[in-house]
């Protein structure tokens, strides 16, 4: 399998399954699921050659496990990261005592004042380890790793969810729960 093609398809799937399904005329249900056959057909019509084999490859080999099938592989959705309103039906889960967030220097002043906000997404994304947070932060420049006192947040009433691909999600992280030196 050509990795460049797989990466291109993965990026396109992120666009249509997380942010803009209307770009190809795709309908997602309230839980973010799309019909696999409809997705393949509409992607192909828009010039993104996709078949079941390539889709399987992208879903199974994506390093971040961004996509998931339902049990019979007739539907697909993004695991998290939506900017459109979907209900992922994730159960509230007690987090680890500390979680991590990767960002870059230009956002630090705002984060110190306002904390971590979900911005255009449905949740703030947190990692269980610093290594993952470094990778996330590195996508935009020199990473700054924030340690989040998630256990304290949970005890104070904040809700946490664990996505299908092991990304921790919460609605916000106020500055008092963030350690800025790690």
UniProtKB/Swiss-Prot annotation:
Pfam families: PTS_2-RNA. Its EC number is 2.7.1.-. One of its GO terms (biological process) is tRNA splicing, via endonucleolytic cleavage and ligation. It is an enzyme of class 2 (transferase). Keywords: NAD, Transferase. Gene3D superfamilies: 3.20.170.30, RNA 2'-phosphotransferase, Tpt1/KptA family, N-terminal domain. The keyword NAD applies. GO terms for molecular function: NAD+ poly-ADP-ribosyltransferase activity; tRNA 2'-phosphotransferase activity. InterPro entries: Ptrans_KptA/Tpt1, RNA_2'-PTrans_C, RNA_2'-PTrans_KptA, RNA_2'-PTrans_N. Removes the 2'-phosphate from RNA via an intermediate in which the phosphate is ADP-ribosylated by NAD followed by a presumed transesterification to release the RNA and generate ADP-ribose 1''-2''-cyclic phosphate (APPR>P). May function as an ADP-ribosylase. PANTHER family: PUTATIVE PHOSPHOTRANSFERASE, TRNA 2'-PHOSPHOTRANSFERASE 1. This is Probable RNA 2'-phosphotransferase. It comes from Flavobacterium johnsoniae (strain ATCC 17061 / DSM 2064 / JCM 8514 / BCRC 14874 / CCUG 350202 / NBRC 14942 / NCIMB 11054 / UW101).
